[in-house]
């Protein structure tokens, strides 16, 4: 990050919080999801818990459904105080940090146990530190998000079936390059535009966790649900590192504890429970389930691809692969 920006952000943070401990601090939290989405509910829980822990001294105002902008705009807005907290898919951080490219590398995380071992352990700590050093953003918490699935208007059973298909992806360099490598025409787009783009034929498909596919009613505009489970991208709670550090210690602790407390547990529980029912609900809504052999997809975007295309995070990728999860998974 530009040193002038770092200094300006820190000075602004110090000025903002150089008030009496009893003064109310209002923080604006932005996300792109509808209220019914699991992580939107988790964000509300987080805000409620911060208010309770600080006796109302810190109030978090939630602005969901892209009302403050796209994920990238929300992330960048943290530096200019148009919003203070962003909750969203971690891959968007890759626009500001090389280390954040790790989040959306395809087929890197093996399962939920592996996910928890990675982001709850030393490797997760190293990822957080590198993002802070490179960008000035502080990842306050990692929330579980189910694996990403592909939804399309035509059947996809092998990589060759992706040829010529415009697949909406988040604004993440890793995701764009990975889907292009798989054979698709990756199309970055603000999430709030996806439903209409599918409806109007601007794109041929999209990829997201089941919870978001369901809550966004994509079953109304695409027919095929493809079990690729190609990425376990975390949802992250992000603030400006300097601003968080400048807050009174009790308020800073309340934010960190709340982000890693009930809200995080709620998201994890709901995602894992939902995985058992979301597929059936989507099938009941008219979608056709396709369960392809994942190996041909994995081979196109495996270790050789990562080391060649994303060399700055190859060491982190190897560290993640070496993490052993409980129960030998």
Residue ranges and their predicted role:
Residues 16-23:
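Sec/Tat signal peptide C-region and signal peptidase I cleavage site
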Residues 1-7:
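Positively charged n-region of N-terminal signal peptides that target proteins for export
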């Amino acid at each position: 990050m530009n040193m002038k920006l770092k200094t300006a952000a820190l000075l602004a943070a110090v000025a903002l919080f150089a008030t009496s401990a009893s003064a109310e601090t209002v923080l604006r939290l932005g996300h792109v999801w509808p209220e019914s989405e699991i992580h939107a509910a988790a964000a509300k829980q987080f805000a409620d818990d911060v208010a309770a822990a600080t006796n109302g001294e810190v109030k978090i105002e939630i602005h969901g459904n892209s009302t403050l902008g796209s994920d990238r705009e929300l992330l960048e807005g943290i530096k200019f105080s148009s919003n203070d907290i962003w909750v969203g898919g971690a891959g968007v951080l890759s626009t500001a940090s090389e280390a954040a490219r790790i989040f959306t590398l395809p087929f890197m995380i093996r399962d939920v146990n592996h996910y928890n071992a990675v982001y709850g352990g030393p490797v997760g700590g190293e990822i957080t530190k590198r993002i802070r050093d490179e960008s000035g953003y502080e990842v306050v918490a990692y929330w579980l998000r189910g694996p990403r699935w592909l939804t399309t208007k035509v059947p996809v059973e092998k990589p060759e079936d992706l040829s010529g298909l415009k697949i909406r992806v988040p604004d993440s360099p890793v995701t764009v390059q990975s889907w292009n490598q798989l054979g698709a025409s990756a199309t970055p787009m603000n999430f709030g535009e996806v439903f209409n783009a599918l409806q109007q034929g601007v794109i041929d498909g999209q990829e997201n966790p089941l919870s978001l596919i369901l809550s966004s009613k994509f079953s109304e505009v695409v027919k095929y649900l493809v079990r690729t489970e190609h990425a376990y991208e975390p949802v992250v709670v992000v603030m400006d590192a300097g601003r968080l550090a400048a807050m009174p210690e009790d308020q800073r602790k309340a934010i960190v504890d709340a982000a890693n407390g009930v809200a995080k547990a709620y998201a994890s529980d709901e995602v894992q429970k939902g995985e058992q029912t979301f597929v059936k609900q989507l099938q009941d809504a008219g979608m056709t389930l396709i369960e392809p052999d994942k190996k041909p997809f994995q081979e196109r975007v495996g270790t050789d691809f990562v080391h060649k295309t994303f060399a700055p995070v190859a060491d982190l990728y190897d560290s993640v692969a070496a993490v052993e999860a409980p129960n030998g998974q």
